């Protein structure tokens, strides 16, 4: 199985010849995972993905396999709520209330989109001047500097693909890391100091 450990953002992929490149259709949850096994569209095989953690793939991004093969990412249609408002102020107010609930939010000039949630729809109905419509659409929220949402610990990407993820991870991490020990053993590692007992170190995730 080929492994893709990097990708090209859609804005930089304009000069690539993708006429024969296979595609892979992914939901937002899948596009946020860094390590997984992918089934290519139209039965064109499988691809292992092991990109840098914290990345979110977008529609039109291009995965690059180790042998140089390109695979075009396509965003799947998802169950979303599209919010419109009578005035820009009312739309901004809706965005404020959704943001307070840590909702992954796609912000467009004339509307907002979020993963459909009936409770949030009821909340918006109480604001006045706001309309929420349920539909199937591509969902590409602005994850911003925070990475988006409440994702803690490892990506939810291992499961049945644990063996692939481990192999891909070790291949990705094979390059040496600079780690200076100049000045003796006085360096400090994040998450623990050397003044305590070594048996009490927290396991790094």
Curated annotation (Swiss-Prot):
It is found in: Cytoplasm. Keywords: Chaperone, Cytoplasm, Nickel, Nickel insertion. Disulfide bonds: none annotated. Pfam families: UreE_C (PF05194), UreE_N (PF02814). One of its GO terms (biological process) is urea metabolic process. It comes from the Bacteria. The keyword Chaperone applies. Residues 171-205 are annotated as: Disordered. Gene3D superfamilies: Urease metallochaperone UreE, N-terminal domain, UreE, C-terminal domain. GO terms for molecular function: nickel cation binding; unfolded protein binding. SMART domains: UreE_N. Its main location: cytoplasm. The keyword Cytoplasm applies. Residues 177-196 have a biased composition (Basic residues). One of its GO terms (cellular component) is cytoplasm. Involved in urease metallocenter assembly. Binds nickel. Probably functions as a nickel donor during metallocenter assembly. Belongs to the UreE family. HAMAP family: UreE. This is Urease accessory protein UreE. It comes from Bordetella parapertussis (strain 12822 / ATCC BAA-587 / NCTC 13253).
């Amino acid at each position: 199985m080929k492994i893709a450990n990097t990708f090209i953002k859609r804005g930089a992929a304009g000069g690539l010849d993708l006429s024969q490149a296979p595609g892979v259709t992914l939901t937002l949850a899948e596009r946020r995972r860094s390590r997984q096994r992918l089934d290519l569209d139209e039965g064109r095989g499988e691809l292992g993905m092991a990109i840098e953690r914290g990345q979110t793939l977008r529609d039109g991004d291009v995965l690059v396999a180790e042998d140089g093969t390109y695979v075009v990412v396509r965003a799947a249609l998802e169950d979303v709520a599209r919010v419109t408002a009578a005035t820009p102020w009312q739309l901004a107010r809706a965005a404020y209330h959704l943001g307070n609930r840590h909702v992954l939010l796609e912000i467009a000039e004339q509307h907002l989109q979020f993963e459909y949630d009936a409770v949030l729809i009821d909340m918006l109905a109480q604001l006045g001047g706001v309309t929420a419509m349920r539909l199937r659409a591509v969902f590409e929220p602005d994850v911003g500097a925070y990475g988006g949402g409440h994702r803690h610990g490892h990506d939810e990407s291992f499961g049945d693909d644990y063996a692939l993820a481990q192999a891909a991870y070790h291949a990705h991490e094979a390059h040496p890391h600079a780690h200076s020990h100049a000045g003796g053993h006085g360096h400090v590692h994040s998450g623990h100091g050397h003044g305590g007992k070594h048996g009490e170190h927290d396991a790094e995730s």
